[in-house]
Amino acid sequence: FQPLYENTYNPPYYKELFENYGFQNYFNQHTYLRRLEVGQLSDSVYERVKRLEESPGYCFKHISKKNLEQVAEDFRLVYNKAWALFSGVKAMDREQAFRIMNILRPIIDERLIYFAYYNDEPIGFFIMVPDLNRVIGSFNGKFGWWNKLRLMWALKVAHKADRVLGLIFGVTPEFHGKGIEAGIIREFEKA
């Protein structure tokens, strides 16, 4: 099994090795792999989506790279409402949000970043990127100009990344429990 992009893989003996040096586990972060096919979502997801579709004002759509500044601002607004309330998480300013989107720009696939809106105000997002490990695994740890070109060709022309990695998901607190996450996932399924 090849780990997802940005997820470490360490042989089993690493745990004991690090613990012998005095390191301790800080927290467990789990990543799940699931194959998604059209029509595979549970009936409850489709029911919640149907209720949303019957309610006026809700809109779900993927982004356009031509409008990345607005995407960054929508991301910031939802992030600050959904994530900045957690301890250890700071609010994000405009520059930081725009910097994040610019860093992601080369690998962004517009069909992998979705926003939810209510009366044209952003209320949720799901940001995914192609799993780069499927492509860069053959680079043997080297990332010079030639491998950068190979990566861009594999992502933009050959579409060799056949898995995606969900980076972050957020819904503003006032819309929790209303099925916004179901609407975003259903929109992704339709694409």
Where are these regions (language model features)?
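Acyl-donor-binding surface of acyltransferase catalytic domains
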Residues: 1-62
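Flexible glycine/acidic-rich beta-alpha junction loops that bind and position SAM and/or redox cofactors
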Residues: 28, 34-35, 132-136, 175
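Acyl-donor binding region in acyl/amide transferases
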Residues: 1-23, 27, 140-191
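A conserved beta-strand-loop-helix scaffold within acyl/acetyltransferase catalytic domains
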Residues: 59-171, 186
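Hydrophobic helix-cap positions at the C-terminus of alpha-helices
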Residues: 52, 104-107, 191
